[in-house]
A protein has these predicted regions:
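Hydrophobic single-pass membrane-targeting/anchoring helices
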Residues: 1-27
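Alpha-helical segments in soluble extracytoplasmic regions
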Residues: 32-93, 106, 125-127, 131-134
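Active-site proximal helix/loop that lines the substrate pocket
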Residues: 103
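Extracellularly exposed regions in secreted/surface proteins, prominently low-complexity, repeat-rich
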Residues: 110, 114-141
Length: 141
């Protein structure tokens, strides 16, 4: 008899729990104002313009060490600004792709470790990613 009462109480508790169940609250996605997004884009593009000048100057010189340093610093600087949560996906993706291309070119610029064709492919990828970055930053941000 006690087991039957316990079973009825358990079933009743289950019915109450199921009928009162509420869907889990979905986490809110932060939203940013147009001004915040524009500021993040401007910061990224200002950083890109700075690193592009350094990369252009140092990779066209006669010191491979300076070229590698410029590429590595450029990738790190782009990484630091592309993490701004107010930055839109188009700008973030372009910055991430360019930073990765800079790192790959740095690695493949060692003439003893990679063939010329691999270096040229990495250089071509940098040029393509820079063109994409120029496009997203064409209007100042």
């Amino acid at each position: 008899m006690v087991a039957a009462i316990a079973a009825v109480v358990a079933v009743a508790a289950l019915i109450v729990a199921l009928t009162n169940a509420r869907p889990a609250a979905t986490p809110s996605v932060p939203t940013y104002t147009a001004a915040q997004t524009a500021a993040a884009q401007r910061q990224l593009c200002d950083t890109y313009k700075l690193v592009a000048r350094a990369v252009h100057f140092d990779t066209n010189g006669n010191n491979p060490a300076f070229a590698r340093i410029a590429l590595t610093n450029a990738a790190a600087m782009l990484d630091s600004v592309e993490t701004d949560p107010a930055l839109d996906g188009r700008h973030r993706d372009a910055a991430r792709a360019l930073a990765a291309a800079y790192r790959t070119l740095t690695a493949k610029s060692s003439s003893d470790a990679f063939a010329e064709v691999e270096y040229r492919a990495a250089l071509g990828d940098v040029n393509a990613k820079e063109a994409a970055m120029n496009e997203v930053c064409a209007d100042g941000g």
